Curated annotation (Swiss-Prot):
S-adenosyl-L-methionine binds at T71, D92, D118, A119. PANTHER family: 2-METHOXY-6-POLYPRENYL-1,4-BENZOQUINOL METHYLASE, MITOCHONDRIAL (PTHR43591:SF24), METHYLTRANSFERASE (PTHR43591). It is an enzyme of class 2 (transferase). Methyltransferase required for the conversion of demethylmenaquinol (DMKH2) to menaquinol (MKH2) and the conversion of 2-polyprenyl-6-methoxy-1,4-benzoquinol (DDMQH2) to 2-polyprenyl-3-methyl-6-methoxy-1,4-benzoquinol (DMQH2). One of its GO terms (biological process) is menaquinone biosynthetic process. It catalyses: a 2-demethylmenaquinol + S-adenosyl-L-methionine = a menaquinol + S-adenosyl-L-homocysteine + H(+); a 2-methoxy-6-(all-trans-polyprenyl)benzene-1,4-diol + S-adenosyl-L-methionine = a 5-methoxy-2-methyl-3-(all-trans-polyprenyl)benzene-1,4-diol + S-adenosyl-L-homocysteine + H(+). This is Ubiquinone/menaquinone biosynthesis C-methyltransferase UbiE. Transmembrane segments: none annotated.
C-alpha cells in the first residue's frame, strides 16, 4: 500500500489508517478509562494532574482549551480555577471519550462547552486561549508537529501550553517498568476492561513517544519559548510547559 507511514504502537501503518486504529482503542476503553487509570497508576495520575493544575496559575475569567480531555479530569480543575466568568472547552477527537467526559461533568453539576475536535485542525480562532492543555493525548496524534502548531495558533500572546504525557523513565528502572508495561498491563486490561489488546497498544505507544528532550525541541520548533519540563515519578511522566510570546 502507498502513502506515508507512521507507527501505531510498535506496528507500522499508513498515516491515514492510524487515526481510525487509535479511535477503535478509545471507543473500546472509554467506559472503563477512569478505573483503569486508577489501577494502572495506583492513583498517581491524580497527583500528576493536580500538579499540572497548580502549575497553570490561572485567574478568574481566563479561557482554557483542554485537548484530548477525555473524561474531564483537567477540565474540571480548570473550571474551578477560572470561575463562572471564565471559559473552559473540553475537546476530544473520540466521541465515546467525549460523551463519558461530558456526562461525568454534568453529573457533578458542571456545564462546559464540548467539541469533537481534531487537535491537528482545531475549530477555534487565533490568539483566543490563555491556556491550552493536553494530558496523555499527544502520543496518540499522527502529526504531533502539526498539533503543536495548532496549539500555538489558538493561544493568546503570553499564553501557556501544558503537555502532560508519559515519557522516558530513569534508566535503572527501565527493566522493571518494561515488565510491568508489557506483561502486567495487558493482563489488567483483560481482567478489568475485557480488552488486553488495547492496553498492549497503550504500553507500546508510550515507548514510541518522544523522550523529554525531543518533545522540548518539538515545542520550540512549533514556536514556543521558555520551554521546560518537570519529571514526575522517576520520569514515568513529564509535564512540559511552553509560552507563546
Amino acid at each position: 500500500m502507498g502513502g506515508q507511514k507512521t507507527h501505531f504502537g510498535f506496528s507500522t501503518v499508513n498515516e491515514d489508517e492510524k487515526a481510525g486504529k487509535v479511535a477503535e482503542v478509545f471507543h473500546s476503553v472509554a467506559k472503563n478509562y477512569d478505573i483503569m487509570n486508577d489501577v494502572m497508576s495506583a492513583g498517581l495520575h491524580r497527583v500528576w494532574k493536580h500538579f499540572t493544575i497548580n502549575t497553570a496559575h490561572l485567574k478568574k475569567g481566563d479561557k482554557v482549551l483542554d485537548i484530548a480531555g477525555g473524561t474531564g479530569d483537567l477540565s474540571r480543575g480548570w473550571a474551578k480555577r477560572v470561575g463562572k466568568e471564565g471559559e473552559v472547552w473540553l475537546t476530544d477527537i473520540n466521541s465515546s471519550m467525549l460523551t463519558v467526559g461530558r456526562d461525568r461533568l454534568l453529573n457533578e453539576g458542571m456545564i462546559l462547552p464540548v467539541s469533537l475536535a481534531d487537535a491537528e485542525k482545531l475549530p477555534f480562532p487565533d490568539n483566543y486561549f490563555n491556556l491550552v492543555s493536553v494530558a496523555f493525548g499527544l502520543r496518540n496524534m499522527t502529526h504531533k508537529d502539526a498539533a503543536l502548531k495548532e496549539m500555538y495558533r489558538v493561544l493568546k500572546p503570553g499564553g501557556t501550553l501544558l503537555v502532560l504525557e508519559f515519557s522516558k523513565i530513569y534508566k535503572p528502572l527501565e527493566g522493571a517498568y518494561d515488565f510491568y508495561s508489557f506483561k502486567l498491563l495487558p493482563v489488567m486490561g483483560r481482567l478489568i476492561a475485557k480488552d488486553a489488546e488495547s492496553y498492549q497498544y497503550l504500553a507500546e505507544s508510550i515507548r514510541m513517544h518522544p523522550d523529554q528532550e525531543t518533545l522540548k525541541q518539538m515545542m520550540l520548533d512549533a514556536g514556543f519559548d521558555s520551554v521546560d519540563y518537570h519529571n514526575m515519578s522517576a520520569g514515568i511522566v513529564a509535564l512540559h510547559k511552553g509560552v507563546k510570546f
